[in-house]
Design a protein with these regions (language model features):
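Surface-exposed acidic/polar loop and edge beta-strand patches at domain peripheries
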Residues: 1-137
Length: 138
């Protein structure tokens, strides 16, 4: 039995002259083509995903300085993962396998429930849908 790629299952969708591949790991957009031409830089499904390529940036999409923030009167400290800037960067959804919710010829939907992680104790579920039509990706 062959091993799964490092990035998990590969979900292929297409519509007309468009095609895309979305990975189970992080619900990342690995490939997007129009008329067979790459529109993004594709990455190898058996290698670590290059930084930020096709990532779903969740539960927060940017840097949190010193990994610290306050919410509803409470202070939180998230892990620092961008050491040169002392920031917590781009959330962590890209590090986890997402659950397949729906796969059709022209669209795929994946879902992920955030674990209780240091500094982000909120119970959230994120759903990502990639859909192709004659106009491209939505």
């Amino acid at each position: 039995m062959a091993l799964k790629p490092r990035t998990g299952n590969q979900y292929v969708i297409s519509s007309g002259e468009w095609s895309a591949v979305v990975t189970e790991l992080g619900a990342s957009l690995r490939e997007l083509k129009w008329r067979g031409e790459d529109l993004i830089v594709p990455f190898d499904p058996n290698k670590v995903i290059p930084c930020c390529n096709g990532w779903v940036l969740a539960p927060y999409p940017n840097r949190v300085t010193n990994g610290q923030y306050s919410f509803d009167g409470e202070d939180y400290q998230m892990p620092i993962d961008e050491f040169d800037r002392q920031s917590s960067l781009h959330g962590y959804a890209y590090r986890y396998m997402w659950e397949l919710v729906d796969l059709q010829e022209s669209h795929v939907t994946l879902s992920w429930r955030s674990p209780d992680i240091a500094g982000y104790p909120f119970d959230i579920t994120i759903t990502a849908t990639y859909a192709l039509d004659e106009n491209g990706l939505t």
